[in-house]
Amino acid sequence: MAVKSLIRKCLFPAAGYGTRFLPATKAMPKEMLPIVSKPLIQYGVEEAMEAGISQIGFITGRGKRAIADHFDTSFELEHQIKGTSKEKFLDDIRYLMDNCEFVFMRQREMLGLGHAILTGEPMIGNEPFAVILADDLCAKPTEGGERALSQLVALYERYQCSIVAIEEVPADETHSYGVISGDEIAPGIYQIKDMVEKPKP
């Protein structure tokens, strides 16, 4: 069940080309790659809902129409499977469509992640918001714990400042990630002092 949150809006930057996933992403957005029975991006929207967020903004680019189509009604498909055993396979997506508000914004130029997020400013205004990168799937904890976004929302409500999820990476792979330095102020919680994008090992 979703919780009431100070953060009501979430952006999904989804305008990139998905070159790391070629050739699978040549004709399909990486956000629509299937994991078991759902596309990656649907897992992200479900995680946002679990964190109490119902206003979802997608920052898209050319060739990403499949994302909008996925979160919309397909009358032909619905008619074709109505009354059959396959109808239940649409229950999850129907629930999201009934309980979320979706906004689609076009990033006209590929100027990076920061620019993609800035493209969402008309929807966000001055409110606190979350950002989910759909190709970074965070699995649901196996023993009843909260998913990553719910943890981040709780930290925001506690500290009232920007919150970033971090993870340890091997030193020889830092050239592929943003890296932080900071002080641990509580178990697993760091106050960031500096952040560097893709430093050399």
Enumerate the language-model features and the residues they cover:
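Conserved beta-loop-beta/alpha segment of the NTase-like Rossmann-fold superfamily
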Residues: 76-80, 87-182
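Residues that form or immediately flank small-molecule/cofactor binding pockets and catalytic motifs
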Residues: 37, 107-109, 197-200
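A short, charged helix-loop
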Residues: 183-201
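Short loop/turn motifs at secondary-structure junctions
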Residues: 6, 52-53, 125, 158, ...
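Conserved residues at the C-terminal ends of beta-strands
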Residues: 59, 132, 198
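N-terminal glycine-rich phosphate-binding loop and ensuing alpha1 helix
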Residues: 2-88, 143-151
